[in-house]
């Protein structure tokens, strides 16, 4: 499969090309938007990867140009801009997906595979044809269970044929699909690779014409025999090729751990990163000279708009580069610089102290990083602990233990976080993702008499911070740890949104074990089905209920109620009262007449406020009744209350 990469960051180009070629993709690289248009409109590609900030023509404009000219090739945007506006702008321009730097190489490759499957005749994760099975995730190929040892080009050729199993490929098409635009092999080279691939397939037991030749046209996969197709399925009714593929795909993938890199491959990738960092570090330090000059010019009020724009591009590139190497903390500093430099207003001398602090911290972090550690490589599915603490000694003890448990940590200084969240400033953008659990370290608390005499502003701020995080992450467990275990402290922590309260001195191992136990018992998302004929209102519900972790299914047609109900098997049901053809009361009675659904919580939601209607709702088997308009938090709490009662009854 052939990919066009349009990116101007040399380090990112090197790392991305390494990952893509390892997974058997052919990559063409250009460094500006206009060249991206030239290549993309001249050669045929299976996927285009674009950075948003490009010289000559930005990625958004380039994406729009491709779509305006009728090009339907999948486009993946790759950028450091982690905000909703940028994502919406990119997707509206015609992009098919959006990945934020720093990215997990495994996730990026998985997204690429998903995009390529959409345009393929074979949309399944595993590619099969008769007794042949190719797993794009692991690049493994077997025939009738026997592994095939293929060269890179043989693998690429076989994958192309499998993804386009109904197509006859001419030699010219294969040359265009399988070789870079800079290579010019002959048709004899194609015939040689086909011949060697056929030989290996026949040696594994495949028919001689497994890869068939249509004279004058090209090469194609011959349809497998009926016996081969039936052998793929584990049940008599799954005799179709599509069903067989699904069955085999599920069986094979269920036995294989997901999103894991073999240790030897990971070590090779780590060695590659360190080798690349050795060459990149001096270049990054050289770029710091531009940022240091910005600080000096800012102090003397001599900064020009052109200099500020240039510095923003430097910070943007540094953020992307540092993210590639897993230097998350350093990347966050670069992102903050990019944010301030890219503001709508020109920087003033009053901003000089802030800029000097950020630039100095960035320079020191880059200078002190001599070796990329394994733990710095993007960790994929490993859980993220957000620790809100200003106690450096405590932080270091937790970091050491958490690393041994496979937990990633982000440390947030308490005074900076709550105000930023309350004013919607982008300080939290640097975290890149929502945490899985929050650990909050309370400051040293004075005695009650001292508090009465002189209120502790730091303690007041920490309680506000706790409440702020609890409101933003209502389903997220927050662990509070303090020096005192008095009832007043525990009560305040629970009122503000804390879930667990620990008292120092608690060993770091015990604290991390507490976090691990919270992670081991994640709540299964509650499935909620909502039936209402107001489609505009229905469209708002998934967003309204998202903070509570509900998996929402909406339905506007009462005639489809029973079919959707059985398919979704919800944990709770919300019904409108007045609907065309069948009203909510009738649907509730229908539900209660089936033993399987007699205990399903049913909430009625209606504009009708009269007591007669409400009494009728409870008479037909409803559990609750809400009047429109209703706020998302009220609806969510009513649903949660019904679910808690059902589960308490079941226990």
Swiss-Prot record:
PROSITE patterns assigned to the protein according to its UniProt record, in alphabetical order: OMPR_PHOB, RESPONSE_REGULATORY
GO molecular function: phosphorelay response regulator activity; transcription cis-regulatory region binding
SMART domains: REC (SM00448), Trans_reg_C (SM00862)
Keywords: Activator, DNA-binding, Phosphoprotein, Repeat, Transcription, Transcription regulation, Two-component regulatory system
Residues recorded as bearing 4-aspartylphosphate in the entry: 51
Keyword hit for Transcription: yes
The entry's DNA-binding region: 124-223
Membrane-spanning parts: none
InterPro entries: CheY-like_superfamily (IPR011006), HPT_dom_sf (IPR036641), OmpR/PhoB-type_DNA-bd (IPR001867), Sig_transdc_His_kin_Hpt_dom (IPR008207), Sig_transdc_resp-reg_C-effctor (IPR016032), Sig_transdc_resp-reg_receiver (IPR001789), WalR-like (IPR039420), WH-like_DNA-bd_sf (IPR036388)
Disulfide bonds: none
Gene Ontology cellular component annotations, sorted alphabetically: cytosol; protein-DNA complex
Role noted for this protein: Required for chromatic adaptation. Thought to be a positive regulator of phycobiliproteins.
UniProt-recorded name of the protein: Protein RcaC
